[in-house]
Design a protein with these regions (language model features):
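Active-site-proximal loop/hinge segments that shape catalytic or ion-binding/gating pockets
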Residues: 1-72, 78-203
Length: 203
């Protein structure tokens, strides 16, 4: 059984997600979602936090390459990264990718934010059987115990990592916060289904 079919069997979910700036859409249409290393010399509007990128720069994937040489998606779009960027919601879109991405050669998954000190990395096939999807897809990650909250926050950001690039062909749909954002997305050339849902962006 493939990693994507295992994922659907265990979660009944079909999509994986990337949160990006609408200005990046023309590049994504042409080049796909690219790794940090592959895109750093190109014009790109990053929404990543500098301290997070510094941590990611030092992470090595066991048996693989640098974390920054992998393009990444999330299992859950409703996560701490989106929460932290709610102030620029009008500039963001959430891209939904087919879970078939999990079947791309050398795909790796992390059981939490890949830059977290406790992160474990697995092949896609093995990882799907080891991730805590109850916590990944939980609506909230706030806990009375600070350690449990920190741990759950990292788990919410479990990642799918693909060497270098995830082609645009895997993109199925997008979600934005408003009609204005939808128009910007269309003007950027996006040609897939678009939904508008302000609540997704904590509005």
């Amino acid at each position: 059984m493939s990693a994507s079919s295992d994922f659907y069997r265990l979660t009944h979910k079909k999509f994986l997600y990337n949160i990006t700036h609408i200005d990046n859409i023309p590049s994504i249409i042409q080049n796909g979602i690219m790794s940090f290393d592959d895109i750093k010399h190109m014009s790109h509007h990053s929404i990543a936090m500098n301290d997070v990128q510094l941590r990611r720069d030092s992470v090595l994937i066991p048996g693989g390459d640098r974390l920054h040489s992998y393009a990444n998606l999330y299992f859950a779009f409703h996560n701490p990264m989106l929460y932290k960027r709610q102030n620029i919601a009008e500039d963001l879109c959430i891209l939904a990718f087919s879970c078939d991405v999990l079947d791309i050669k050398n795909c790796v998954v992390s059981d939490r934010n890949a830059a977290a000190s406790l992160a474990k990395f697995y092949s896609a096939e093995e990882g799907i059987r080891n991730l805590d999807f109850d916590k990944i897809f939980a609506q909230f990650w706030i806990h009375d115990d600070p350690y449990e909250q920190s741990n759950h926050k990292a788990i919410k950001c479990a990642e799918i990592l693909v060497p270098h690039c995830i082609p645009y062909d895997y993109v199925v749909a997008a979600c934005v916060v408003s009609q204005n954002a939808e128009q910007r997305l269309r003007n950027a050339g996006f040609d897939r289904e678009v939904s508008i849902n302000a609540k997704v962006f904590y509005r």
